[in-house]
Regions:
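Intrinsically disordered, low-complexity, charge-rich terminal extensions
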Residues: 1-184
Length: 184
């Protein structure tokens, strides 16, 4: 088995993680308890991509709009489509991040880091200020990655435990509570 086949075989894990994360974000009104980090806020917004099938028979469903309009994406889950891309806004403390997460490769796209006093000031040309700004941005990237990694670890703890069956039942119930979307 080559590397590409291995990625394809394991992509379901990222799709399950993204679906679990979406459910967790709605379970407590956007607040997710993360051990060691406290509560963080997660909002799935604007853009989702769902997939079904493989090869030439693959179908893609792109859902975009306001949070309320993402009902079509939940309807897609009901008919067996898998969440592949999602735009997420995450708030941890005073820092608000926005990014797209691609499930199959756990790839980040279109990352927006929080605005800080350092990044909002006019460029002074001062080397120390520039170095400070770069270090601050590196810190913010690391904070984002560490937080998403902690969320993934939390998911794996449940997914690989006997607690997965009750959790899966809750997720299925959440998916099925959405009325099937019939566009007029």
């Amino acid at each position: 088995m080559d590397f590409v086949d291995l990625i394809e075989e394991k992509r379901f894990l990222g799709q399950e993680f993204l679906t679990w994360l979406w459910w967790k974000s709605e379970e407590r009104g956007g607040s997710v308890a993360l051990p060691g980090y406290g509560d963080i806020s997660l909002v799935f917004e604007k853009h989702m991509l769902l997939e079904f099938g493989e090869g030439e028979s693959a179908e893609k469903l792109i859902c975009s709009g306001l949070k309320a309009e993402l009902q079509e994406a939940r309807t897609g889950l009901q008919v067996g489509k898998k969440l592949e891309h999602a735009r997420i806004r995450m708030t941890k403390g005073d820092n608000e991040y926005s990014f797209t997460l691609v499930a199959s490769l756990m790839e980040f796209r279109n990352i927006r880091l929080p605005k800080t006093a350092m990044t909002e000031t006019e460029e002074s040309g001062n080397r120390e200020d520039m170095e400070g700004m770069i270090l601050e941005r590196i810190y913010l990237f690391e904070e984002l990655l560490q937080t998403v990694n902690a969320l993934f670890r939390s998911f794996l703890d449940v997914r690989l435990d006997q607690d997965w069956s009750p959790e899966l039942a809750k997720i299925r119930s959440w998916i099925s509570t959405t009325p099937l979307h019939n566009p007029s």
